Amino acid sequence: MAAAAFAVPRGVQLRVLTERLLRGGVRELLRPRLSGSTPGSERDFSLSHSRGTVIVERWWKVPLAGEGRKPRLHRRHRVYKLVEDTKHRPKENLELILTQSVDELGVRGDLVSVKKSVGRNRLLPEGLAVYASPENKKLFEEEKLLRQEGKLDKIQTKAGEATVKFLRSCHLEVGMKNNVKWELNPEIVARHFLRNLGVVVAPHALKLPEEPITQRGEYWCEVTVNGLDTVRVPMSVVNFERPKTKRYKYWLAQQAAKGMASTSFQKI
């Protein structure tokens, strides 16, 4: 006699599969692969990296049990309070010591604090920085002392590198009057650097062409930053124009009003 076929509901099938997974499937998945065979497609959880730690403790203490017996747990014993969470706390920055000059960070020997992704993916692999260990700090302190004593070549500072980068993109205009005789000198150029570009340049750090500049035209000047880097800045000598300040604009308005008043009086 043939056995009768019954249709198993889909919900029952899913429940049976779930029970089978709970019995053996998950255990096999979590069991460490200790054999020397080639690993399969399952992930080896025993060798996976722990990315964080969460420490909790019971809110209610579990009473002591007799020898050889397990303590009796109640529902209140399954209430926990958080002690420490290293997985979700803010990530700390990475302290490094620069071995070379890096834009917007610093120069060799500077102690910087950057994101871990920046340090591990860019600075450390490219050899631009090293870890700020006590040994490395001591080495760079000794190097700094040797540079101060003059036994090693000096290096450009962070502000100096920013100044050099800025000067390479500048164009200086020097205004000279046409009613007097003049000759351009480093003091005049230094004042125009401060007035037009906002850069303080010492006269001894400026170098002009050997031929005297007594006429308007296109010239150049060289600026030496901290005695290390020299930048050639294009320079235009133009006719002097009075700066259009509020006081000067008010004076121009008064002159225009006086001129209009005199013209109308002559017509009358």
Curated annotation (Swiss-Prot):
- Main localization is mitochondrion
Cite the InterPro entries for this sequence: MRP-L9_N, Ribosomal_bL9, Ribosomal_bL9/RNase_H1_N, Ribosomal_bL9_N, Ribosomal_bL9_N_sf, Ribosomal_bL9m_C
Looking up Pfam families in the UniProt record yields:
bL9m_N, Ribosomal_bL9m_C, Ribosomal_L9_N
State a single Gene Ontology molecular function.
structural constituent of ribosome
Q: Which UniProt keywords apply?
A: Mitochondrion, Ribonucleoprotein, Ribosomal protein, Transit peptide
- Can you tell me where the transmembrane regions are? none
Q: Is the keyword Secreted assigned to this protein?
A: no
One GO term describing the cellular component: mitochondrial inner membrane
Q: Which family does it belong to?
A: Belongs to the bacterial ribosomal protein bL9 family.
Q: Can you say what this protein is called? A: Large ribosomal subunit protein bL9m
Quote the subunit structure annotation: Component of the mitochondrial ribosome large subunit (39S) which comprises a 16S rRNA and about 50 distinct proteins.
Task: Output the SUPFAM superfamilies linked to this UniProt entry.
Answer: L9 N-domain-like (SSF55658)
Q: Example GO biological process term?
A: translation
**Which compartment or compartments is the protein found in?**
Mitochondrion
Q: Where is the transit peptide?
A: 1-52
